Amino acid sequence: MKIYLVGGAVRDRLLQRPAGDRDWVVVGATPAQMEAQGYSAVGRDFPVFLHPKTGEEYALARTERKSGRGYRGFVVDADPAVTLEEDLQRRDFTINAIACDEDTGTLVDPYGGVRDIEQRVLRHVGPAFVEDPLRVLRAARFMAHFAPLDFTVAPETMDLMRNVAASGELDALVPERVWQELRKALVSAQPSAFLRTLHDAHALGPILPELEALYGVPQRAEFHPEVDTGIHQEMVSDMAAKLAPGDDLVGFAALTHDLGKGLTPPEEWPRHIMHEQRGIKPLKELCARLRVPTEHQQLAEAVCREHLNVHRIDELRDATVLELLGRCDALRRPERVARIALCCEADKRGRLGFEDSDYPQGETLKRLHQAALSVQARDLDTTHLKGPAIGEALAKARVKAIAAAR
């Protein structure tokens, strides 16, 4: 029996980045031997065990053979005769196919992962890459994760990704996995790299057609010097990651705020009148398909519908501001307002040449929201009021408070 550290922990060590969970591979062992040494079996699809003291995962070396469609269609062989090199060969990218003997510090790198780390290249291990469509998504997510290090996708790997997209295999991805990869990308350093990689691989359309529809759609250059709505979508996602690092609620709402522009009739380009209303339908469809959590969907719908109103909040009547807050459910969910403000700021600054601009509208929205929130029904004299009249009096008092806070 021989144990090696593998995967992301080795990769991140070589990149001099903080490592996450450590994964181990065990060569030359059987499940019975692992359990005899106190390891607990937890793997459902293949033999994985938890260390009796550290709780870290130890997987028996295995090979995988394609047996059906999608990323679940594999036959696993975890025979003790499976070698370390065979186990590493089934992995997705060379940078993840490096093992380390922790006793000696010796690296086992049969597929050139160390070289690719040095050259900042994301490269597939072998032709079996095309057997698992999830790897296309993982490639895009890795590009977003490692964007600050200037990684590129190897041309031959991009060719294989396009082959997977053309094969129809991406249709076999289960919604939860697509959402999981998207969610990770949204909190990465540069979510745009996720979008751009999938777009270049012709995979964004099959996976996220609502986002692919924005590429090539022009906007008015005086407001959007970047012109292409797809590029604007990338810039907004990156700005959201900068303004709200680690917040996938903000990331998702910012990403999807302009979906309506993908439905603008070409004869109306580059104007997109009413795109904020048109965007709700494709947003609902995307959320239903990916089974997006309700909290994410509600925030995204609020930002999609109201971002133009927030941009011009100084021009809105006081009563209209209260109506806006009501549509966003901000009086019952006050924590939502700060996120809406961040999303709208990301939209405004996610434009070529506007990256460093101020966005006072965000502070105005929060200030007026606090003013409205400071007035509660219990603060009013409702002695002679009944039913709807109480609500009307509360609304009038809140409008007055908003006016005073201007």
From Swiss-Prot:
Cofactor notes: Magnesium is required for nucleotidyltransferase activity. Nickel for phosphatase activity.
Residues binding ATP: G8, R11, R91, R138, R141
Keywords of this entry: ATP-binding, Hydrolase, Magnesium, Metal-binding, Multifunctional enzyme, Nickel, Nucleotide-binding, Nucleotidyltransferase, RNA repair, RNA-binding, Transferase, tRNA processing
Residue sites binding CTP per the record: G8, R11, R91, R138, R141
GO biological process: RNA repair; tRNA 3'-terminal CCA addition
Single GO term (MF): ATP binding
Name of the molecule in the record: Multifunctional CCA protein
Organism: Stenotrophomonas maltophilia (strain R551-3)
